[in-house]
Amino acid sequence: MKNPEKPLLLFLILASSLASMATAKSTIEPCSSKDTCNSLLGYTLYTDLKVTEVASLFQVDPVSMLLSNSIDISYPDVENHVLPAKLFLKIPITCSCVDGIRKSLSTHYKTRTSDTLGSIADSVYGGLVSPEQIQVANSETDLSVLDVGTKLVIPLPCACFNGTDESLPALYLSYVVRGIDTMAGIAKRFSTSVTDLTNVNAMGAPDINPGDILAVPLLACSSNFPKYATDYGLIIPNGSYALTAGHCVQCSCVLGSRSMYCEPASISVSCSSMRCRNSNFMLGNITSQQSSSGCKLTTCSYNGFASGTILTTLSMSLQPRCPGPQQLAPLIAPPDNVPKELMYLPSPSPSPSPEFDDIAGGGSSIAAVPAASPGGATVSSSNSIPGNPANGPGGSISIASCPLSYYSFIALLIPIGSCFFVF
């Protein structure tokens, strides 16, 4: 007599094996407070999309998204510019503490015709989330059939690690590993080291697989604004920009240093006074005067935004010698295409050369000469942006996240800690 349980047992073993083959790892940061931090998502466009359409996918400000990628916002109608498929962007998000771990739940998605949880996770959001994670985040909604217009919460990975990496200011990027990536290539691309990446992600060995999500520390400039300022804690990664004070102020991280430089933004909005009190200095003005005793510097600096007022500080200092001009990251023109010959190269170095600077991470690289304004003039670069992981950030853990796709034969969710496996 045949054992009816044997085929079922073999079936479950096979299903389990297939599921484990599709398992990806991600780093989770435990937390206990209600504080938030700025974080970044590494996102590769799955199709041509307008700037506003990309921003809408993540419910972020389109102008801030452009500046996070050093894209010039002075171009006419830049928010409706069509960005090419395969372009890699850094998406600025707010990282919260939810159910004891760091994640972002501020992104919502309305389903469209032919959507599945798999296509939403793998295609629309580029593997930053799994179908199972979407299902868990929307457990009160019947997802057996996705009706057009169903509103879904999209849980996205993020990390804070106290805004530091090896005791230096840092912002963390959630990066989805591609098939051609190596740890050395990722480390080189984002100006870090394999050892640091391994420590931050609590990896026993620097082994990665496609679909893994790494927390990548980006060196940054931190602010020192008063706690009552709405932009208290602003941190900007090197080579990027940030808008603050209601789009009135544009800040950057000076290349080769940890100094944040702020000046009036290049977009037209109604703003409060940007003049330093009891002076003729405007926000961002710096003067130097060399004398026999040294260099006298006078600076009108940004000090935060509070109650609709732009706070400024006038400071004077004496230094041994006068500093050279600010070395700020070049702004680039809104990209129209992604060079095919660069689309599938391994992660390149972020170090600028005379011809290229990489902004197209997961998909490709784009020429990053200073952007030419619509009138033909060159736009001067006038700004930039932004774990205690000497032995890895305290409390960071690597776990196996959920499989990236469903298996059609049976859907059996087995919760294990913070992860769900689908057989």
Swiss-Prot record:
Tree of life domain: Eukaryota
Residue pairs linked by disulfide bridges in the UniProt entry: C31-C97, C37-C160, C95-C158, C97-C160, C221-C253, C248-C276
Keywords recorded for this protein, A-Z: Cell membrane, Disulfide bond, Glycoprotein, GPI-anchor, Lipoprotein, Membrane, Plant defense, Repeat, Signal
Residues of the signal peptide: 1-24
Location of the protein in the cell: Cell membrane
Lipid-modified sites (GPI-anchor amidated glycine): G394
Effects seen without this gene: Impaired sensitivity to peptidoglycans (PGNs) leading to higher susceptibility to infection with virulent Pseudomonas syringae pv. tomato DC3000.
Coiled coil segments of this chain: none
Gene3D superfamilies in alphabetical order: LysM domain (3.10.350.10)
Residues bearing glycans: N162, N238, N285
Residue ranges constituting the LysM domain according to the UniProt record: 107-154, 173-216
Propeptide, residue positions: 395-423
Role noted for this protein: Required as a cell surface receptor for peptidoglycan (PGN) elicitor signaling leading to innate immunity. Plays an essential role in detecting PGNs and restricting bacterial growth (of Pseudomonas syringae pv. tomato DC3000 for example).
Name of this chain's protein: LysM domain-containing GPI-anchored protein 3
The species this protein was found in: Arabidopsis thaliana (Mouse-ear cress)
